[in-house]
């Protein structure tokens, strides 16, 4: 009987481990028009948007647009492209979209593609 309860307990724990909610990376802060602070509940990353170049005169408008597109706690997928001076360079795709935020940025006329 004791072995039966042990097996049931192992089964319940296994079920909870395998079917628990997966936490994704999320936006913590828009630092500038091309730099974001992203966290995944135990680490934070400074991430630069890949393939973007923003002119200085559009900086303020670009930051506002980026904050509207990626508000705090927005879940995102990262596609790393490399790193520079300890900063991750990545494409960022919001969960509610299949389009990279860089493509949207360029389509809005706020950035140019430098890849």
Regions found by a protein language model. Name each.
Residues 1-2:
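N-terminal secretory signal peptides that target proteins for export/translocation
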Residues 5-7, 15-115:
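Small beta-barrel nucleic-acid-binding modules, primarily SNase/OB-fold domains
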């Amino acid at each position: 009987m004791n072995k039966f309860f042990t097996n049931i307990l192992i089964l319940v724990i296994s079920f909870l481990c395998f079917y628990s909610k997966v936490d994704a990376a999320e936006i913590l802060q828009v630092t500038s028009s091309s730099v974001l602070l992203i966290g995944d509940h135990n680490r934070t990353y400074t991430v630069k948007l890949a393939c973007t170049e923003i002119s200085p005169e559009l900086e303020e408008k670009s930051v506002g647009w980026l904050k509207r597109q990626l508000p705090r706690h927005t879940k995102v997928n990262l596609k790393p492209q490399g790193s520079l001076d300890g900063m991750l360079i990545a494409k960022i795709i919001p969960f509610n979209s299949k389009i990279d935020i860089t493509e949207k940025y360029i389509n809005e006329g706020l950035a140019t593609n430098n890849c």
